[in-house]
UniProtKB/Swiss-Prot annotation:
One of its GO terms (molecular function) is structural constituent of ribosome. GO terms for cellular component: mitochondrial small ribosomal subunit. Residues 241-258 have a biased composition (Acidic residues). Disulfide bonds: none annotated. Residues 230-258 are annotated as: Disordered. This is Small ribosomal subunit protein mS23. It comes from Eremothecium gossypii (strain ATCC 10895 / CBS 109.51 / FGSC 9923 / NRRL Y-1056) (Yeast).
Amino acid sequence: MKIQTNAVNVLDRTSFYLQAGLLKKTPAWYNVVARIPPVTKFAREPKLHDPVSGKYKGELDIMTDRLNRNTETYKTRAGSSDRQTAAVHKPSKLRFIEDKLRSLFFQQHPWELSRPKVLVENMGNEQYDWSRMLQLGKPLDGESVVQRTLYLLKSGAHREMLAAYDQARFEFYRLRMQQELEEQIAYEEATMVGAVFKTTAVEHGLQQEQKVLDKWKEDVVAGLQLMSAKKNSTKQSWAEATEEKEEQDSAEPEELKL
């Protein structure tokens, strides 16, 4: 199959169209692609060095690694597993410190995930000053702890990540307690003057879940009562039949005496 190079030559063709006057306006992506042009070499080269760990993947196996301990012989022929394509062409995984801090924080604070999030895409150029935890226009959440930890590491306030994380975490606790206390005071003051608050989205969800649980409990109790009633009726009928038989047996000798 012939290699398709149309997408690679898009910068050259667009430049020709601009010079010839076929395009009146420069595309928005033109300067970006001109600064970072696409790769024109289509041959796959093995990635022998891991960019994250720096480990070299092209080392050959040592002969002692091919020794079979059971037969005391060396493996000299390639098997099916050895003939498989090595992972030298596979791109390395991207690992970031922020992801480790996020997973650690939300593993220790799972209830922070229940707080509502604003799913609005931003421009990515927000300039926050992480010398303090609170930011204008950004709610206090786990991301604040992550960015505050990175700032403490970069500024040199702490050399160890855990120490910086602990300081950011304690600052988060203090601000969260202050925020909850202010919300509680405002709620009590508003209630005192006659304000009525509707249930939140989380409370509404819990109420609907509790209704389902109550209905399930009623069905289970009714089923257990029905099963116990069937068992009792069977035992009672068997007991009545036994009593009637005993009465008949005791009545027959009396009739003979008469």
